[in-house]
A protein has these predicted regions:
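Carbohydrate-associated surface elements
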Residues: 191, 212-215
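Acidic donor-binding loop of glycosyltransferase active sites
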Residues: 183, 352-353, 370-373, 390-404
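Membrane-proximal helix-turn-helix segments that form the acceptor-binding/catalytic region
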Residues: 168-185
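A charged, aromatic-enriched C-terminal amphipathic alpha-helix characteristic of glycosyltransferases
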Residues: 15, 452-457, 467-501
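Short hydrophobic beta-strand element within catalytic cores of glycosyltransferases
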Residues: 418-421, 426-432
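Conserved donor-binding/catalytic core segment of Leloir-type glycosyltransferases
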Residues: 229-279, 285-288, 301-303
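A conserved catalytic-core segment of Leloir-type glycosyltransferases
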Residues: 35-124, 319, 328-376
Length: 513
């Protein structure tokens, strides 16, 4: 079967990029022919991409890398402006959020992509197609395919929550145009489905909506003994050494940061994801002195990139120096420090304001030595994570903003790391699927409530997990891994996408409470 996918962004990093890379790879493994429209100028470096199509000089040219061609990546000629959902930097592009685009810029972007889809479809005659993102993939396919090819839509949280919801007057009709012709609409969680239904206000949409969460590569993401995890971590550090890690989202010291970690002798806690305010990494940093006071050997590693990276480093420095006034200022300014409007980080502020008397003194004392082992790695490729995550005893997912699905939590669990996630939206739904794998006393450690007590709860859960007797913790790690491998796999995701595009919804799970 020939499958056309419109993504429109990169094929590495986090979130929807990883979803589309993994989906395309799974489709190829299942024997399908994939035609993937993206904006990754290094797409040809991926092992499953066999040809790359570009429009240099205005005409489509396809350069074959290897035969047989199973997957072709196409880069539509959109120019230098890349519309995004959250302000960030993208190498080679001027990134602008969709609301910042002029009407003319938006029209040019849509026309360029729809034209590319039309030309590719005329050339390869796809059997089914998939549009990603509520804005603007579905409308691009609706215009480019002109009703000739059945398609599904995959909803990712950012376009819905950051663009359509707050700017309905401008983007709602564009979203409706794209959804109207879809055979099925896939959401990662019940939470995302309900949010979509509310925003779209279409009484017929729930009947076409099905669960279609991301998956995990169960062959790559798996537990490793501590010695092997250490070897793989050092091998990853070696690969990064001398590489151009200081490019888009990377950091020059990534290799040294990873080489400094020793899972054989120290418990490692990690965060993997974008470094933006809504991901809640400030809560993890504030919790860390409380963890370090109980488990002095524990190490914290932050993996990712984003506009809030420097502020997070400044927050850690302020906490480590006992400068709670600066930490409180950071909490007060909030999103302003990543280029957005001022707005207090209320959960961080609540924690800092609650530190008084002896509790404040104990916290300042603990923080003084807590951050010496903190390491920032910058962006790592998704393909690097199977060599990183088995070295973690826990991975924290502290997002304060709704998430459509907790893919990072699933991948962490598959590797035997405790996936400690905020208890809301798609993260909570993932946690509910994993909790039955572990004993009753361990299950509450998988989540924390988003609220004024978040910092203390993160610290309590991490401390309790790291303090478990080794045999109980290892049994729980093995059970979490087995559970995630049973429930999530990319081959099933790929088959669900094809079924949704064809309108065969009866066999796909509905988003239920």
């Amino acid at each position: 079967m020939r499958v056309l996918i419109f993504h429109g962004y990169l094929l590495r990093g986090t979130g929807s990029n990883v979803y589309n890379t993994s989906l395309a790879r799974a489709l190829v493994a299942l024997g399908h022919e994939v035609h993937l429209l993206c904006q990754d100028r290094h797409a040809g470096e991926l092992d499953f991409v066999d040809a790359v199509g570009t429009w240099k000089g205005g005409a489509l040219r396809v350069d074959v890398i290897r035969d047989p061609v199973r997957c072709t990546a196409y880069l539509p000629p959109i120019g230098d402006v890349l519309p995004v959902y959250v302000a960030d930097a993208y190498e080679g592009f001027t990134a602008r959020t969709f609301p910042e685009l002029s009407d003319a810029e938006l029209a040019r972007y849509l026309a360029a992509n729809a034209g590319a889809v039309r030309e590719v479809a005329d050339r390869v005659r796809p059997d089914v197609a998939l549009a990603n993102h509520l804005i603007a993939g579905p409308a691009v396919l609706a215009r480019g395919l002109g009703g000739r090819v059945p398609y599904a839509v995959k909803i990712h949280g950012s376009a819905l929550e950051y663009v359509v919801r707050p700017h309905r007057e401008r983007f709602l009709e564009l979203a409706r145009e794209g959804l109207a012709g879809a055979g099925g609409v896939l959401v990662g969680s019940r939470h995302t489905g309900e949010s979509l239904w509310e925003v779209m206000d279409d009484p017929e949409l729930p009947a076409r909506t099905r669960l279609g969460p991301p998956g995990v590569d169960v062959h790559s993401f798996r537990p490793r003994p501590a010695a092997e995890a250490g070897e793989r971590l050092r091998a990853l550090a070696g690969r990064l050494e001398g590489a151009d890690t200081a490019g888009w989202g990377g950091e020059a010291g990534a290799s040294e940061a990873l080489r400094d970690l020793s899972p054989e002798i120290e418990p490692i806690v990690g965060y993997v994801g974008k470094l933006i305010v809504s991901k809640g990494v400030d809560l993890l940093l504030a919790a860390w002195p409380l963890v370090a006071a109980e488990v002095p050997s524990a190490r914290l590693v932050i993996v990712g990139f984003g506009t809030y990276r420097d502020t997070l480093a400044r927050l850690a420095e302020a906490l480590g120096a006992g400068d709670l006034a600066t930490a409180r200022e950071i909490a007060a300014r909030g999103r302003e420090l990543e280029g957005g409007p001022p707005g207090e980080l209320t959960y961080l502020a609540a924690f800092l304001d609650g530190l008084e008397g002896e509790a404040r003194e104990r916290y300042v004392s603990a923080a003084a030595g807590a951050f010496g082992g903190l390491r920032f790695t910058g962006r790592l490729e998704h393909g690097d994570l199977p060599d990183l995550l088995p070295s973690f005893l826990a991975q924290v997912v502290p997002s304060t903003f709704p998430e459509s699905f907790g893919m990072v939590a699933v991948e962490a669990a598959a590797c035997g790391a405790l996936p400690l996630s905020a208890s809301h939206s798609g993260l909570a739904e993932v946690t509910r699927t994993l909790e039955p794998a572990v004993e009753a006393e361990v299950a509450p450690l998988l989540s924390f409530e988003r609220g004024p007590g978040a910092v203390e709860e993160i610290a309590r859960n991490l401390t309790a997990w790291l303090g478990l007797p080794a045999e109980r913790r290892e049994a729980a790690r093995a059970a979490l891994s087995e559970r995630s491998r049973e429930l999530y796999g990319w081959e099933g995701v790929a088959q669900g996408v094809i079924a949704a595009a064809q309108g065969r919804l009866e066999g796909l799970p509905q988003p239920r409470p």
